[in-house]
Amino acid sequence: MNSRDAIKVGLDMADFVGKGYLGDLTDAELLHRPAKGANHINWQLGHLIVSEHQIIESVAPGSMPALPAGFAAKYTKETASVDDPAQLLTKEELLKVHDAQRAATLAALAKLVDADLDRESPEAIRSYAPNWANAYSLQGSHWLMHAGQWAVVRRQLGRPPLF
């Protein structure tokens, strides 16, 4: 196994855990806020998708498919308080966009050689992803960080623990 394979394992495990937590949640349940001021899962999914798109596109320009028209504008810090489902995408729509972005991330990763992972990231992301390995690895850890919050929402909604 090489470094790229190890990063892919992390991305695949993040998808497995995240999609496991999301599997039986309804669109309405994705709007549940676990605490006052906390972001609901629908917004978090949009945020994760926009973040992955921007970060991977910054290290591998032209590698990511375009986000649907208006997508990024629906999932900004300013829209985190939106609870109106008419202003947001459904779980099915979000996962479809996520799957397209993740497939592109994996394709871009597969084109690299291990030495590429040491390349310095663009200035805009260097504070949290100093090199390309960090930029790619962050996609899995970011997803898992949010998935930990989804586990709490699941328990609040009466769902059993999964993992």
Question: Where on the chain are the PLM-derived regions?
Answer:
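Basic/polar N-terminal segments that are highly enriched at the extreme N-terminus
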Residues: 1-5
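Hydrophobic alpha-helical core bundles mediating ligand binding, dimerization, or RNAP-core interactions
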Residues: 11, 15-18, 22, 98, ...
